[in-house]
Amino acid sequence: FMNGEVHGVPTFTPFSVIFNVKPKFYEWYTYYQSLSISDKANYPDLVPWGVVFPTSSPAGSEFPNLALHPAMLYELVLNLIGFFIIWFILRKKKNKASGYMWWWYIIIYSINRIIVSFFRVEDLMFFNFRAPHVISIILIAVSIFFLKKDNKKVF
């Protein structure tokens, strides 16, 4: 996280304001919404919770002094949620075949990766889609296939 090797895109999107936890968020958001489009583009503090990485880090050298989405933290939280789903819900399921929890992990991780990829700087594209999205969809399809194949009693 502090090294800045895994970083998100600049936090310009309207969706990104949902995650703010600063106390004066509503004042900031109201003021920001009153700006014209050109003023919004030049606004110095686009999101109050963005992370400015040191210029010596890869993220800081690519986006100097610019607040970025902390994509690695988003992924951490989503992976913890996925772990709790697997540990407290799926592992207690009866009549599961071998590999059952593994395939569910692949599905949950792929969904997490699809979500987090919207906040990351991705250079690798497959046609007009980001490569992690394509790979994740393929992994979800393969996992569902094996879950249905190996767990006929479950479905």
Question: What do these predicted ranges mean?
Answer:
Residues 1-155:
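A feature for loop-to-transmembrane-helix boundaries and adjacent hydrophobic helices
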